[in-house]
């Protein structure tokens, strides 16, 4: 088996494991918030930093493709005036593998004050970001596909797959 094939199989296994580890309550909670967002013609605001930010942009584009008003909000810009785009009826999907990303944790209290629903898509369900959110989607992986276990590979594949699945249902 080639190294490329092995990497693809490991990422596929991580996605399959994620499908098994998501609880029905988590999924139903996220879908209910997204349905409410669509019914109210509100926005889905998606945010993340680094590789999670890149995945967040892709998820926003996918939701826009199916007709839900969705946008990516850079959390740094949010802290410097762009939070004005977020309304109480909106839903915010926050992506972070660690769940401890400082910029997202700084945005969290502002979202709470606005009454904006928060869904955390995190690699650590016991993280600060998870504790500050209304719904937590567990996107944890055992290890990255990268030989050094450093580059976000399996974790970004899982986060993107969960985002795609949310948009597809």
What are these regions (language model features)?
Residues 35, 43-169:
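Glycine-rich phosphate-binding loops that contact phosphosugars or nucleotide phosphates
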Residues 1-40:
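An N-terminal, well-structured beta->alpha segment
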């Amino acid at each position: 088996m080639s190294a490329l094939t092995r990497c693809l199989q490991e990422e596929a296994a991580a996605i399959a494991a994620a499908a098994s580890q998501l609880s029905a309550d988590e999924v139903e909670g996220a879908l209910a918030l997204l349905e409410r967002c669509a019914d109210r013609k509100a926005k889905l605001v998606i945010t993340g930093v680094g590789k999670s930010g890149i995945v967040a942009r892709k998820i926003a584009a996918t939701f826009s493709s199916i007709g839900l008003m969705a946008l990516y909000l850079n959390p740094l810009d949010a802290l410097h005036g762009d939070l004005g785009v977020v309304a109480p009826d909106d839903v915010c999907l926050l992506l972070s593998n660690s769940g401890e990303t400082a910029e997202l944790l700084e945005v969290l209290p502002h979202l709470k004050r606005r009454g904006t629903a928060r869904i955390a898509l995190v690699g650590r369900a016991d993280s600060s970001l998870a504790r500050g959110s209304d719904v937590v989607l567990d996107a944890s992986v055992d290890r990255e596909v990268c030989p050094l276990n450093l580059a976000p590979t399996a974790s970004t594949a899982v986060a993107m797959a969960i985002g795609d699945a949310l948009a597809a249902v």
